[in-house]
Every structure is written in structure tokens, then in C-alpha cells.
């Protein structure tokens, strides 16, 4: 399956890990995906999910520095996760920034509120 679908599933795993009162581990969150999508790039998904969780405070600070008149804690959970994923990938992969930002915008169109993809695009363009 495509890297795009792998990013979507990584988003869903991170969303599950963000739920309050959950004791899920990263491995458990990813294992839920394996049953339904055995052809995904699980090395990439694990790298992305664990990287975001391991570096969350640093990613949040980097994102916060690029928010105008907003606090990261006030963002929708979906937007925070998408921004963290893209910020981590921008800093730690060889994938062209344009591709990473475009994929984040597509995730926002799929999972966030109507026009939030524009906000995601603006923040990530400033990070890059």
C-alpha cells in the first residue's frame, strides 16, 4: 500500500494514543491496524508514531513558535496530531518538504474541520 495510506493509519494510531483514559502502548495501537491492513509499511508507521510520541514536547514547541495568537493546547486534537506528524517528518526524513506538507493538508481535509487544511498548510510552510 501507499505511503499516503500508511500516514493515514499512523494518524489513526496517534489519535487513539491521544484519547484520555487510555493505557494503549504504541505497539498495541499499531497492532490494531495490522489486522485490517497487512500490506502497509509498518516500519514507516512505527517510526512515525514512535517518533512523534518520543519528541512530542520538542515538536509542540516548534509548532507553538509558528502559531500566531493561538496556543497549541487550543487546537483541535486532529490538527495537533497532523502538525506533529508533519513536523517530525520534515525534521527527520529525506522526503521532499512539499510532499510532506501536501500529505498533511490531505489528512486535514479528511480528518479535520472544513477549512483547517489552510491553517495546517500555513503553519507547516513556516516550519519548513
Curated annotation (Swiss-Prot):
GO MF annotation terms: RNA binding
Keyword annotations from UniProtKB, A to Z: RNA-binding, Transcription, Transcription antitermination, Transcription regulation
Keyword Transcription among record annotations: yes
InterPro entries per the UniProt record, alphabetical: NusB-like_sf, NusB_fam, NusB_RsmB_TIM44
UniProt xrefs under Gene3D superfamilies: NusB-like (1.10.940.10)
Gene Ontology CC: one annotated term: cytosol
Family annotation (Pfam families): NusB
SUPFAM superfamilies: NusB-like
One annotated GO biological process: DNA-templated transcription termination
NCBIfam families hit by this protein: nusB
HAMAP family the record matches: NusB (MF_00073)
Similarity annotation: Belongs to the NusB family.
Function: Involved in transcription antitermination. Required for transcription of ribosomal RNA (rRNA) genes. Binds specifically to the boxA antiterminator sequence of the ribosomal RNA (rrn) operons.
Entry protein name: Transcription antitermination protein NusB
Gene name as annotated: nusB
Amino acid at each position: 500500500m501507499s505511503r499516503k495510506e500508511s500516514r493515514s493509519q499512523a494518524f489513526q494510531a496517534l489519535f487513539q494514543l491521544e484519547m484520555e483514559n487510555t493505557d494503549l502502548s504504541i505497539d498495541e495501537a499499531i497492532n490494531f491496524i495490522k489486522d485490517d491492513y497487512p500490506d502497509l509499511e509498518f516500519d514507516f508507521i512505527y517510526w512515525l508514531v514512535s517518533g512523534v510520541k518520543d519528541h512530542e514536547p520538542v515538536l509542540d514547541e516548534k509548532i507553538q513558535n509558528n502559531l500566531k495568537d493561538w496556543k497549541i493546547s487550543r487546537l483541535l486534537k486532529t490538527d495537533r496530531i497532523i502538525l506533529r506528524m508533519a513536523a517530525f517528518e520534515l525534521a527527520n526524513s529525506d522526503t521532499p518538504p512539499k510532499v510532506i506538507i501536501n500529505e498533511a493538508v490531505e489528512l486535514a481535509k479528511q480528518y479535520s474541520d472544513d477549512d483547517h487544511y489552510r491553517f495546517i498548510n500555513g503553519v507547516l510552510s513556516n516550519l519548513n
